[in-house]
Amino acid sequence: MVKLRFYVTTPIYYVNDKPHIGSFYTTLIADILARWHRLKGEEVFFLTGTDENSQKNVEAAKNAGKEVREYVDEMARIWQETWRMLDISSDDFVRTTEDRHQKAVYGFFRRVLERGDIYKGKYVGYYCVGCEAFLTKQDLVDGKCLIHKTEPMALEEENYFFAASRYK
């Protein structure tokens, strides 16, 4: 009989601040799923981690009077320790600043680029730093983000796009 496999991951969290109830809730749900599948005898891999490459992290480091790497290292330790204290049963904790993560992403990117699945194009939009997202004009009220009440940055930048339409 083939042993069933189950993979669960949380979002990789921004480390601009300490974990909060929302991040705990998401991680707890993933932990419950992982434990349930382990109880059923399935082979489980549960991944969580931190995204240390965001504008929010840069701003938080600046506000704390620290270099970005120093700040994200400190915050990543807090996130890892929090999950340990809460007995989260993850099998791995990945940080986007780790060599292994960067090598894996580079390898994946290179493969899809070679297949022609990645192409360069121009993206024009309104970027809200607070939301860490691009907004449309319809998302704005009086030219401001509805959530943060701030004017988003008008950005035009060259980006890489994934040709998802090939995989319909």
PLM features per residue range, with description:
Residues 2-168:
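N-terminal, positively charged nucleic-acid-binding surface of large information/translation enzymes
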